[in-house]
C-alpha cells in the first residue's frame, strides 16, 4: 500500500466532491460526508428540513424523525420517495468518487464495505450509472465494484493491521 510522505495517502474519504454538503471529518462536501453513515444521516436531515420548509414532502414522508441509514433503508422498502432520494444522492456522489479513483488508478476491482455492503441494492444501479457516465469506457469495462465480505468487522481488521505494523517497527 502507498502511504505517502505523511502516512495519509489513500484517505479517499477526504476528497471533496462538492462545495456544499454534509461534513466528513470536518470537510464539507467530502466523500465521507456523502457516503458514510453519519454523513448520510446529516444529509438526510438537511434534505428533510429543506423540503419541509418548501412544503414539498409527500404525505407519507411527513413526520420522519429517525434519519439513520437503517431506518431510511426500511422507509425505501416501504415506498418512501424522500428516503429513496437520500439514497440516490448518496449513490450519485459515491459513483462520482469511485469514478475519480477509477480514472486515476485504473484498478481491476474496488471493494467497498460498511453502508454499501449493507445496502447494496439501494446503491448499485445508480452508482454504476454514474461511473459509466463519468469514466473512460475501457476503464469501466475492466473494473469490478464488489462489496466487502468483512461485514461490521472491517474496523477490527483495520485496527489489527495498524497494531501489527507498529509491532513490526513501522510508523
Protein language model features and the residues they cover:
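Hydrophobic alpha-helical segments and helix pairs
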Residues: 1-7
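A short, polar/charged loop-to-alpha-helix boundary motif
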Residues: 7-24
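ATP-binding/phosphotransfer module of carbohydrate and carboxylate kinases, centering on a glycine-rich
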Residues: 19-171
Amino acid at each position: 500500500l502507498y502511504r505517502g510522505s505523511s502516512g495519509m495517502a489513500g484517505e479517499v474519504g477526504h476528497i471533496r466532491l462538492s462545495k456544499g454538503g454534509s461534513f466528513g471529518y470536518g470537510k464539507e462536501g467530502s466523500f465521507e460526508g456523502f457516503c458514510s453513515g453519519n454523513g448520510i444521516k446529516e444529509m438526510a436531515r438537511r434534505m428533510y428540513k429543506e423540503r419541509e420548509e418548501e412544503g414539498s414532502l409527500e404525505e407519507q414522508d411527513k413526520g420522519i424523525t429517525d434519519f439513520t441509514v437503517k431506518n431510511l433503508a426500511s422507509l425505501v422498502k416501504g415506498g418512501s420517495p424522500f428516503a429513496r432520494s437520500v439514497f440516490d444522492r448518496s449513490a450519485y456522489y459515491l459513483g462520482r468518487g469511485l469514478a475519480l479513483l477509477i480514472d486515476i488508478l485504473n484498478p481491476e476491482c474496488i471493494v467497498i464495505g460498511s453502508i454499501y455492503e449493507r445496502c447494496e441494492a439501494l446503491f448499485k444501479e445508480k452508482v454504476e450509472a454514474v461511473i459509466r457516465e463519468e469514466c473512460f469506457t475501457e476503464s469501466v469495462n475492466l473494473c469490478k465494484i464488489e462489496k466487502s465480505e468483512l461485514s461490521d468487522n472491517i474496523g477490527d481488521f483495520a485496527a489489527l493491521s495498524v497494531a501489527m505494523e507498529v509491532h513490526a517497527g513501522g510508523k
